[in-house]
């Protein structure tokens, strides 16, 4: 797949295409937007299904306004990437496989912007911790630190040859593919907490 990646569009439709490609032999619903509200690892819930359309438009428009991260210095790229990466992570459009799908998606965005990621330089634990902190607190500092380690200009060779090497190095911080479906009472509590009508 990596040899023939199309140009980045920065859209959820492209995320759906990637997800379908990766998981078509695993899930009947590969490439389809989730139909349930979810949380993972006991943290804050992902974007509410009820407002998925708004979330999709926000993620796509923010990335588009940032010109798909093109024409930026490496520091600007990392800063804007961290915000956009967190936006799409919070959106969490699929029941499973969001992380792997996002890696391909962001690899495309990075390549078109003149960069690539050496994912094998970090562990799954680093990725989990940075993603969880950003999702739960909207603080992207750990994501920025992570991307500072793995972001390289295209002309610099990658050290780690396996794109997904960090997925198998050690235990997950939270069990993979384990998510909680929000019950009505949980969803009502979050709606009250965040003032959602």
Please provide the spans of the model-predicted regions:
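FIC/Doc superfamily catalytic core
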Residues: 1-96, 100-197
